[in-house]
UniProtKB/Swiss-Prot annotation:
Source domain of life: Bacteria
E.C. number(s) listed in UniProt: 2.4.1.21
Similarity field: Belongs to the glycosyltransferase 1 family. Bacterial/plant glycogen synthase subfamily.
Binding-site residues, ADP-alpha-D-glucose: K18
Pathway assigned in UniProt: Glycan biosynthesis; glycogen biosynthesis
Source species taxonomy: Bacteria, Bacillati, Cyanobacteriota, Cyanophyceae, Synechococcales
Gene Ontology molecular function: alpha-1,4-glucan glucosyltransferase (ADP-glucose donor) activity; alpha-1,4-glucan glucosyltransferase (UDP-glucose donor) activity
Record's protein name: Glycogen synthase 2
Gene: glgA2
Residue spans of biased composition, Low complexity class: 488-497
UniProt entry tagged with the keyword S-adenosyl-L-methionine: no
GO terms classed as biological process: glycogen biosynthetic process
Keywords assigned by UniProt, alphabetized: Glycogen biosynthesis, Glycosyltransferase, Transferase
Catalytic reaction annotation: [(1->4)-alpha-D-glucosyl](n) + ADP-alpha-D-glucose = [(1->4)-alpha-D-glucosyl](n+1) + ADP + H(+)
Region (Disordered): 475-513
Amino acid sequence: MVQAKILFAAAEAAPLAKVGGMADVVGSLPVVLRKLGQDVRIIMPLYGFLWDKFGQEPGQYPRSKDPIWSKQVMGQVADIYESVLPGTDVPLYLVSHYCFAPHRIYYGEDEFWRFTFFANAVAEFAWTYYPWKPNIIHCHDWHTGMIPAWMHQAPDIGTVFTIHNLAYQGPWRWQLERMTWLPWYFSAHNTMAAGILYADQVNTVSPTYAMEIRTPLHGEGLQDLLAWKGERLRGILNGIDIDRFDPRTDPDLEANFSIDDLSGRAANKATLQAKLGLTVNPDTFLMGMVARLVEQKGIDLLIQALDRFLDYSDAQFVLLGGSGEAYYEGRIREMAERHPGKMAYQKGYQPKLAQLIYGGADAFLMPSRFEPCGISQMIAMRYGCVPIVRRTGGLVDTVSHHIPSKGIGTGYCFDRYEALDFYTCLARAWEAFQHKETWQALQKRGMASDFSWHRSALEYLRMYELILNLPLLPEKPPEPPNSPSSSPPKLKKPISSQPRSKGIPELQQRPEE
């Protein structure tokens, strides 16, 4: 077994900075990989709201007030501080510059410049920080897409690019030309395309999404490039932190419960109803949703179908909405006003309320237009909250349709992105809820599902092995079946497909235990 040095580069990492599911991946996967014997570290921007915590909470500030690295990047000075991811032993590098000072992660007129600067700083750091030099830089989404393009000139550093959401592709080439120097052979349209083109290996966060993005419907204009990537594009399903998301010990619940004793869910449901002004009734079908108010999450479909469903049933609905579009927020508020005592809307991400929704609601709604993976449905099932989802992306890989006559399935699914199909699915779930024994069996099947990060981490190690040509797994498990891939078209061979040197000489052989 060999120990590799792997640097995760991302815009978010839970629990320090979180907007979407990428933060959960970056905050959880390195912890598991370190347990499997790898030297994994994280690098991310030092946002203004993190500065405010320095000196207040142990583990959330640099070990030294002086930067460990300071150099010119894109004509500006970048400083890097060393810290540790709170609650773990994962080393954390924080890139400091005044452009990250505002108390935000995304948006703003300088968003493209900020993350291009961050990507350049990561590349320079990997090249020049001699106390620790990574063998692989694991990049996440468009914010780090330029790193594989720059690092391809370094044959001793491999790159992995993970696509969390193909819809967000970053600055286009003409914008990049104004911000930074580009090599003459750069041929990607934007930073997302650059990451896909130049990375040694590319993966998405679910097998189904890896197949979907090779088609015009989901490819966002990059389907030909993704199809050309062939076997170097794969889907690895995300996991969840099963220690953090454990209904037996979760401190944010009114009452804890387990797969063997679900009685605590009734107390959580009553607390949730009372807290949000809903009619307290244990026999009412209570649906929950935790999502950003954007089209991707199916908010337009939700407005069409749920408004009528609440009119014609005794069901209740709770929505915890994060950042999103003002239009959808206005429509949701109007719905809540039309259904007093039956619908509640809370704005902004509230972790404690989210946990109470998972632990108290009967069903969890995810009518997504597209969903690269989705974390919420896995958390919901772990808490006995039955998911109602549209079959797309990672929802296909994690939720199976309930067939009462056969006693199989973990949730309710519909295919077409149409209000009638969603309404019908809601009605079927509501009807099944009336049969308590059947519903409880459905809950327990979901709770028994294995969504731990361990299996996913082994898949990532297999992918790293393909880059390093060295064994990283403690024991060689059987290889998974080959995932479907498209044959590369006959194109001029770009520099991104040139073979690398065999192995990394700096790696040290670890003694077998």
